[in-house]
């Protein structure tokens, strides 16, 4: 992750599930779920190379936010039409669509450069539609990614990991409370 240029930006990324019967297409609320399905990757980290900038379409006068980022190698292949949701800095959640995806090397695990834009903030209708069309939810774990492990965790695994983290903190606190000697400022061997 440290070898890929850009600033870290945590997003909830909706990657299109493409098969022989469905092609790459932008998200449309009017399309049924069987014709457009997604895999949600929560807490995914994009490496921003061009920060979000306000731009205006001269013909329509409509404002849009545009930017560019890198997708780290070994994660997934981004497609034009993928969408993601993330904070845009003013407390609002932006609804972004990938407008360009380019593989940057011939290697199997390559960095992908993406460009994205938005013309609106997320809305309850968009969230509801994306939720209906989501067939798989994964969590991105940057620690697993850094150590070359499978970077995705399923929802049930994430719940177990959260419980283990909480249990570890409770155990650590109890251990120090029971075996720490205040007088000598050290741990006493049990």
Where are these regions (language model features)?
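Interface-prone segments of viral and bacterial extracellular assemblies
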Residues: 1-190
